[in-house]
């Protein structure tokens, strides 16, 4: 799948959250989106998933402006997992089956998707309120996978997890990508971006400053703003 942001602006509360962003996600891989808080990273994901609409500019999916694509179909093909796992009251099985069942599908193999994220059949009938943070996040990913997405948008999925759970989620992300799912991951963790990113986008004050292969961005940043950010000195510049 190709996702193209063409001169996208998003204006809210009297200011631009994203400014004139142009980028095409066209190669299967793991794209990490980094930048300081308030740079527009999460907004970019919400725009791609059509939770919000661009103020100006347009977004294209495989060459078709996404306003011309049924929003339900769009969200089946582009799954999104949030920073805090959002699960509905009920069992793990009911959560995984939710999307397909709303479309009238029957005989959904919830166990298949549960095992795809490394959880056993013992979890199927667990109440979601009894899951750990890492388990809940994996169930969120399993629910997204049940829609057979081509792209996964992940908004800081490990920010509140312990190192062991973080490692499990990172390995899962890499495996899903190897299986053909494009991943766009927002993270504040630069080490995580280095570990799993193929490409890195750096946003600052709503502008896309750099978009390069991850190793190139970290080893040889082009922009002075990028250098300050990687050196942890960007706060001084903001002041």
Curated annotation (Swiss-Prot):
Pfam families: ABC_tran. Keywords: ATP-binding, Cell membrane, Membrane, Nucleotide-binding, Phosphate transport, Translocase, Transport. PANTHER family: ABC TRANSPORTER I FAMILY MEMBER 17. Part of the ABC transporter complex PstSACB involved in phosphate import. Responsible for energy coupling to the transport system. The gene is pstB1. Its main location: membrane. InterPro entries: AAA+_ATPase, ABC_transporter-like_ATP-bd, ABC_transporter-like_CS, P-loop_NTPase, PstB-like. This is Phosphate import ATP-binding protein PstB 1. GO terms for cellular component: plasma membrane.
């Amino acid at each position: 799948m190709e996702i193209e942001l063409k001169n996208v602006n998003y204006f809210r509360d009297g200011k631009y959250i994203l400014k004139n962003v142009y980028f095409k996600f066209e190669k299967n891989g793991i794209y990490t989106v980094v930048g300081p808080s308030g740079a527009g990273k999460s907004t970019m994901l919400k725009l791609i998933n059509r939770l919000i609409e661009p103020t100006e500019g347009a977004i294209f999916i495989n060459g078709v402006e996404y306003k011309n694509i049924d929003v339900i179909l769009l969200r089946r093909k582009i799954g999104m997992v949030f920073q805090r796992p959002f699960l509905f009251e009920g069992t793990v099985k009911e959560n995984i089956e939710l999307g397909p069942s709303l479309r009238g599908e029957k005989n959904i193999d919830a166990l298949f998707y549960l095992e795809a994220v490394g959880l056993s059949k013992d979890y199927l009938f667990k109440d979601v309120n009894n899951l750990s943070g890492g388990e809940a996040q994996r169930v969120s990913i399993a629910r997204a996978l049940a829609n057979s997405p081509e792209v996964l948008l992940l908004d800081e999925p490990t920010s509140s997890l312990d190192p062991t759970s973080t490692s499990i989620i990172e390995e899962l992300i890499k495996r899903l990508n190897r299986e053909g799912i494009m991943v766009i991951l927002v993270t504040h963790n630069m080490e995580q971006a280095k570990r799993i990113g193929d490409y890195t986008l750096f946003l600052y004050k709503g502008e896309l400053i750099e978009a390069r292969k991850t190793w190139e961005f970290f080893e040889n940043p082009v922009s002075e703003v990028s250098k300050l950010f990687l050196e942890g000195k960007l706060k001084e510049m903001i002041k």
